[in-house]
UniProtKB/Swiss-Prot annotation:
CDD domains: MFS_STP
Name of the featured protein: Sugar transport protein MST7
PANTHER family per record: SOLUTE CARRIER FAMILY 2, FACILITATED GLUCOSE TRANSPORTER, SUGAR TRANSPORT PROTEIN MST8
Induction: Induced by cold and abscisic acid (ABA).
Residue intervals on the Cytoplasmic side: 1-17, 103-116, 161-166, 223-294, 342-347, 407-425, 472-512
Membrane topology: Multi-pass membrane protein
Gene3D superfamilies: MFS general substrate transporter like domains
Length: 512
């Protein structure tokens, strides 16, 4: 399958360079990943803290502390506790549908600003919570903020970056997610030691810090030339394109942006257009890539890491420290992707990371099966625990340089402008839907499948690696405005792409 995405036509190379202005703008915009990552990391740690459990989820606390014969696999199985974690993702799913319209009508910048502000309110509510209802309302507001940010930020990064650097700059978003996870794990480790049992308030309330960074940063950001053009601001778009490319010679790129913008204006309903045959490759990728990303099992490892480590026999402090270790691995492994994605391409990282995750999951399942069996009762030695953590780190590192960043990068770069906001909304909806679904059923699956849960996720990774090998073309170095070419040259997708796209461009030319 070496020619799965290759073609003979060379991509365009627009004049311009990587400017300091673009790098800073992308770095600030990527702070949207901090709020998502912080929440992923903070939730699992807080739900493993005894004062938090005894106050809000006493039945779980009783199973953990008082019922000595509870199966290790099942002691955290609680619907209210699961709802606390997963309600954010359901809210993000719904919010992303509205965020699509806001992104298209008001621009990427305003969507990020709104997301940061709403997340800030949710953080304050969670930190001050006195009952479960207040916790859930706060989580819903956090989810709305996350939905807005992950709708707008990947689009913003893809549109600001020059084609040859798009992979690296877009992956900064995933890097910020990993930084958020790491800091959340570190904060949980130290707040768990606070005397008086109120450390969980600090953990939840400090989510306001990344929210403030994103809110203030969004105020200072420029909007993208693509977004300005789609809203009829031609002069501003031309000026911004000159600034971000660092050259006066923007004619070819600007002309292509105008053509894409006119094609957008010819589309009355981008949602209906997305369902047309010529956009079948983009629709399939916008559904399957985020879905398969969640079926790696990564989020259950990251936001349930302390709970998971407690389940397999680690003590409370040890489980939080193990989560810090996986957070460090997650962050540093993301740098591998930043350094290699524009050199080796997307497919190589997808396939290599997939194979590594498959190996790690099946070995983890075997290790836990040997030690715990189905009874879920065993004392784990320090040496055995270290081996388990090592293979979890092997899994996390593979995800961090493959499906983690590429699950956001590839969908954000393959959509033509006329369907970009709608298609990105589909990406967010399916990502959040399956994040919600997996979060909602994970503790139940752990209780029912036991060590078999790792084999389940390993099987999913086998399927997704095969999917990439056969159906995903290489997108490295292709300008967004030319991305249709790779589908037209693909052995399978070429049957869907061709004349339809030409008709859209002809419609655009008649409107000029």
């Amino acid at each position: 399958m070496e020619n799965a995405g290759a073609g003979d036509g060379a991509p365009k190379h627009y004049p311009g360079k990587m400017t300091v202005f673009v790098f800073i703008a992308c770095l600030v915009a990527s702070s949207g990943g901090l709020i998502f990552g912080y929440d992923i990391g903070i939730s699992g740690g807080v739900t493993s803290m005894d004062p938090f459990l005894s106050r809000f989820f006493p039945s779980v606390y009783a199973k953990e502390k008082e019922v000595v014969d509870t199966n290790q696999y099942c002691k955290f199985d609680s619907e209210p506790l699961t709802l606390f974690t997963s309600s954010l993702y359901l809210a993000a799913l719904i919010a992303s549908l509205f965020a699509s319209v806001i992104t298209r009508k008001l621009g990427r910048k305003m969507t990020m600003l709104g997301g940061g502000f709403i997340f800030l309110i949710g953080a304050v509510l969670n930190g001050a919570a006195v009952n479960v209802a207040m916790l859930i309302i706060g989580r819903i507001l956090l989810g709305i903020g996350v939905g807005f940010s992950i709708q707008a930020v990947p689009l913003y990064l893809s549109e600001m970056a020059p084609a040859k650097m798009r992979g690296m700059l877009n992956i900064i978003f995933q890097l910020m997610i990993t930084v958020g996870i790491l800091f959340a794990n570190l904060i949980n480790y130290f707040t768990d030691k606070i005397a008086g049992g109120w450390g969980w308030r600090v953990s939840l309330g400090l989510a306001a810090v990344p929210a403030v960074i994103m809110t203030v940063g969004s105020i200072l950001l420029p909007d993208t030339p693509n977004s300005l053009l789609s809203r009829g601001k031609e002069n501003e778009a031309r000026t911004m394109l000159r600034r971000i490319r660092g050259t006066e010679d923007i004619g070819p790129e600007y002309d292509d942006l105008v053509a894409a913008s006119e094609a957008t204006k010819a589309i009355e309903n981008p949602w209906r257009t997305l369902l047309e045959r010529r956009y079948r490759p983009q629709l399939v990728m916008s559904v399957l890539i985020p879905t398969l990303q969640q079926l790696t099992g990564i989020n259950v490892v990251m936001f349930y890491a302390p709970v998971l480590f407690k389940t397999i026999g680690f003590g409370g402090t040890a489980s939080l420290m193990s989560a810090v270790i996986t957070g460090l691995v997650n962050m540093f492994a993301t740098f591998v992707s930043i350094a290699t994605v524009d050199r080796f391409g997307r497919r190589v990282l997808f396939i290599q990371g997939g194979i590594q995750m498959i190996i790690a999951q099946f070995i983890l399942g075997t290790l836990i099966a040997v030690k715990f069996g189905t009874a879920g009762v065993a004392n784990i030695s320090q040496g055995y625990a270290i081996v388990v953590v090592l293979f979890i780190c092997l899994f996390v590192s593979a995800f961090a340089w493959s499906w983690g960043p590429l699950g956001w990068l590839v969908p954000s770069e393959i959509f033509p402008l006329e369907i970009r906001s709608a298609a990105q909304s589909v990406v967010v909806v399916f990502n959040m839907a399956f994040t919600f679904f997996i979060a909602q059923i994970f503790l139940m699956m752990l209780c029912r499948l036991k060590f078999g849960l790792f084999f389940f996720f390993g099987a999913m990774e086998l399927i997704m690696t095969g999917f990439v090998l056969v159906f995903l073309p290489e997108t490295k170095g292709i300008p967004i405005e030319e991305m249709d070419r790779i589908w037209g040259e693909h052995w399978y997708w070429s049957r869907f792409v061709g004349a339809g796209r030409n008709r859209v461009m002809q419609m655009a030319s008649t409107n000029v």
